[in-house]
């Protein structure tokens, strides 16, 4: 990513200390300072961007109060095609800077020593290959003020980084009357007293200056403030190519996730419960299962104090209080609180019945309905009443039965305030007020309020008599007719007149008898 041409200094990445601050740093912190600044400088040198860097340090020469001022300036003027710049050849040319010493005859001190080197991406053939590109010039200047007897000429054997490292290493012996400054041109002091400093001062300042992230991943465009973090991040992209499931093609960013996923295909379940011996494919599933044995329910609802063994169950339960229904049907826009409810509802639109009974071949649109149907074949009745030990094949039947013992009748008619123990009885009762007769005979168009009444009526047309007396073999079309007939054999007369105490086997006979006492004539 090309940066705009201009001057880039150490301002955002350099650290500045006053003499009081520097005295508070221990040797380890000063060493850290030198390492950080050296690494920073090397990074800037290696970047192919237009930049100017100035490094200015102060150190004691050990010769009285004489001080040495090291000033390093790096000018780099980028070409128009910075991506084509050949830094490999520059690295070769960095060796051998010319040090020129000029003596100031007027004061007897050494005049500024300057090392100047023009660095081009290449010379000769390389310039021809990159015709049209401007030459890239690096000038590394350093000025020293020393009491020297005579001028000297040096030939540098090291690279830029080595020269800077030498300057920074000298910074550990700072004079008490001077300060260390890594700033370009302008001199800004930080006024901190000795009491305000602490051992983490260097670390805190470094974190502030390193907030600017300059290392960017070309794949995900994430930025990092040092190259080591970028390299660590790039491992993720490398593993993305390696962590792919051979069966379904699903990709994972870590190998351990891929290993867990493969158990879905192999059926491997390495995690076993010590209590019941049940095995699981994931350790997290085993952890959740163990809560069934311990009875632990650490997740409590703040609204109703109900507790749950799983956090996901608590989150799902909260929707009861909030009324949230995040799952919406795309066909009819009906919303549901749970994804499982939406899945069941969707089958109503498709008409799909994917669950088949292996015994009778009957199909169902829900797995729970198939499981309930299986109990008809097996005779299983897993739900038992604690009061009378009566058993039921469905939980809803047990709940309904319990109301017999408790006398609870939660369903109330809004018209007449009559109460019922079953919702179905309330719905049936409401038809008395509305006059609704939803069940219609296809033969004679006669309508009925109850489906059982329609079924009985249809036997008039078919002549079917499915109810047979075990005593005499007589058959009947309605079960009520069979019950009345059986009283002929048993002699049972359950209907009694309150006036004279006479009993009857049929209710209709008792009603007819009442007219004798009342004088009513039908």
Curated annotation (Swiss-Prot):
Signal peptide residue numbers: none
One term under GO cellular component: nucleus
Gene Ontology biological process terms from the UniProt entry: regulation of transcription by RNA polymerase II
Underlying gene: ZNF468
Stretches assigned to the KRAB domain: 8-80
Zinc-finger in keyword set: yes
UniProt keyword Nucleus, yes or no: yes
Domain of life: Eukaryota
GO molecular function, one term: RNA polymerase II cis-regulatory region sequence-specific DNA binding
SMART domains: KRAB (SM00349), ZnF_C2H2 (SM00355)
Zinc finger (C2H2-type): 215-237, 243-265, 271-293, 299-321, 327-349, 355-377, 383-405, 411-433, 439-461, 467-489, 495-517
Free-text tissue specificity from the UniProt record: Isoform 1 and isoform 2 are highly expressed in placenta, pancreas, and small intestine. Lower expression in colon, ovary, testis, prostate, thymus, spleen, kidney, and liver. No expression detected in heart and brain.
Family designation: Belongs to the krueppel C2H2-type zinc-finger protein family.
Species the sequence originates in: Homo sapiens (Human)
Record's protein name: Zinc finger protein 468
């Amino acid at each position: 990513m090309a940066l705009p041409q201009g001057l880039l200094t150490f301002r955002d990445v350099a650290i500045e200390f006053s003499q009081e601050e520097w005295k508070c740093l221990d040797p380890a912190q000063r060493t850290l300072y030198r390492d950080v600044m050296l690494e920073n400088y090397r990074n800037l040198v290696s970047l192919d961007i237009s930049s100017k860097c100035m490094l200015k340090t102060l150190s004691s020469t050990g010769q009285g109060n004489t001080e040495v001022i090291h000033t390093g300036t790096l000018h780099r003027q980028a070409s128009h095609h910075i991506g084509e710049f050949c830094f490999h050849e520059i690295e070769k040319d960095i060796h051998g800077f010319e040090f020129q010493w000029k003596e100031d005859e007027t004061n007897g001190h050494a005049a500024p020593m300057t090392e100047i080197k023009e660095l081009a991406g290449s010379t000769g053939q390389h310039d021809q290959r990159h015709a049209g590109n401007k030459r890239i010039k690096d000038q590394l200047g350093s000025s020293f003020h020393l009491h020297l007897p005579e001028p000297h000429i040096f030939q540098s054997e090291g690279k830029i980084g080595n020269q800077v490292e030498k300057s920074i290493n000298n910074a550990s012996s700072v004079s008490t009357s001077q300060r260390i400054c890594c700033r370009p041109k302008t001199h800004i002091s930080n006024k901190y007293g000795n009491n305000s400093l602490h051992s983490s001062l260097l670390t805190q300042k470094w974190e502030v200056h390193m907030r600017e992230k300059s290392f960017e991943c070309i794949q995900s465009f994430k930025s990092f403030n040092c190259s080591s973090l970028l390299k660590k991040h790039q491992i993720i992209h490398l593993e993305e190519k390696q962590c792919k499931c051979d069966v379904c093609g699903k990709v994972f960013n870590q190998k351990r996730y891929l290993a867990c996923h493969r158990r879905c295909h192999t059926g491997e379940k390495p995690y076993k419960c010590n209590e019941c011996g049940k095995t699981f494919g994931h350790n997290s599933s085993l952890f959740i299962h163990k809560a069934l044995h311990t009875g632990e329910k650490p997740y409590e609802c703040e609204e109703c104090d109900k507790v749950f063994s799983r956090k996901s169950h608590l989150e799902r339960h909260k929707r009861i209080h909030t009324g949230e229904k995040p799952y919406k049907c795309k066909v009819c826009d009906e919303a549901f609180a749970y994804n499982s409810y939406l899945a069941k509802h969707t089958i109503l639109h498709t008409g799909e019945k994917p669950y088949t009974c292996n015994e009778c071949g009957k199909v169902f649109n829900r797995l729970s309905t198939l499981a309930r149907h299986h109990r008809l074949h097996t005779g299983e009745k897993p739900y038992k009443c604690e009061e009378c030990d009566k058993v039921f094949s469905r939980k809803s039947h047990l709940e309904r039965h319990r109301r017999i013992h408790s006398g609870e009748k939660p369903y109330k008619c809004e018209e007449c305030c009559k109460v019922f123990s079953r919702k179905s009885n309330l719905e049936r009762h409401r038809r008395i007020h509305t006059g609704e007769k939803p069940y219609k005979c296809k033969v004679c168009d006669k309508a009925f309020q109850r489906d059982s009444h329609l079924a009985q009526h249809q036997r008039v047309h078919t002549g079917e008599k499915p109810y047979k007396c075990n005593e005499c073999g007589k058959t009947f079309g309605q079960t009520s007719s069979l019950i009345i007939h059986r009283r002929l054999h048993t002699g049972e007369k359950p209907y009694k007149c309150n006036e004279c105490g006479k009993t009857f086997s049929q209710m209709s006979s008792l009603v007819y008898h009442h007219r004798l006492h009342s004088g009513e004539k039908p």
